[in-house]
Every structure is written in C-alpha cells, then in structure tokens.
C-alpha cells in the first residue's frame, strides 16, 4: 500500500464525488462508498480515538513495527502508525465530500451516514492533531457542525475561524522557496485544505461570515 494512503484516498473520494455529480455514474458512487469506508477504518482500527492509522494492508500474521494487527472486525487487516497532519487533510476531505453527496438528503445510506457522523464527532472531540488551535481544529469543528447541526460545534468553529481567517486569506506562503523550487507537497496539502473549506462554506456557512471571499483571496 501507499504510505500516504489516507491523503490520496481522501482526494480520490472527492474525485468520485465530482464524477458522480457530473455523470451520475453508479461506478463513481460505489467507488466513493468503498473508499470512504476505508478512511473510517483508519480512524476505527487503532482502538485509540486520539490517533488514526496512516494506511492499511491485508494481515500478514506477524507484522513488525510500525505495523500492528487489527482486532475484532478488523482482524483481517494490519494498520501502520503515523497518522499525522498531512494524512488528516485527506481524511477530512473525503469525509466532507461523502457526507455532502450521501447524507444531506435521504439516499438509502443511513447506516453509512451514521458511521460518518460518529467518526467526525470523534475527530472533533478526541483526535490529537485536531485539538490545538489551528486549521486542523477549524476543519474538525466545522465539519462536525455541518454533519451534526450541533450548535456547540458551530460556536467553536466560528471562534476558530476568527483566528485562522487572516492566515487563510494569505494563502499557502510556503509553496515557493527562495531559490524558486516549488514545495509541491505543501501546494497539494494547501489545495486540499482550501477545497474542503470551500465546500464547508458553501454547504454550511458560518453565521455572519463570508468565508468564501476569504478563501478565494487566499487561493
């Protein structure tokens, strides 16, 4: 497996959401559902809500560190430690697009949508990379507000927005170094983050805030 699976799978979920909206392809919808289930497994398999797995693979029987055996429902899998800021971006991007496509209105995916809501709230409440003030916290609280319509999450997201908006309005200032070499990893992560925030601003605006204008300026 790719050691950056969480990030790339989130981007793939978004691509299949876009594809489905344009074409109505059943294959795109099936791809999205299968892939977002993988993202949620990253959250669930570790047994510790403060962390998440970086990637998964089929069980080998005796995994060396940093791989660990799954248990219970996930006994057929192994997971790799190291879920971090970069991988978090992919998880959030994928969950946001899956909820927007499948869960805003009845689509016959009630069980999957309940699982999405559970994982999103666990991220907002417990995941270590989403607790300190910063854009990860903004993403977690805003997505939780969107999927649950819970006012407490909305208040926390709005408060965090006021802190992060000046930074977001300036864009990703690390994409070019002084010698002119682009930071392609940083560019991609910034793009994923701005796309996710733009989706949230469209689907669940923060009260009294024109987040879209700030994000467009940053982009």
What do these predicted ranges mean?
Residues 1, 22, 35, 117-219:
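Catalytic domains of carbohydrate-active enzymes that cleave complex glycans
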Residues 1-29, 34-37:
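N-terminal carbohydrate-binding/catalytic regions of secreted carbohydrate-active enzymes
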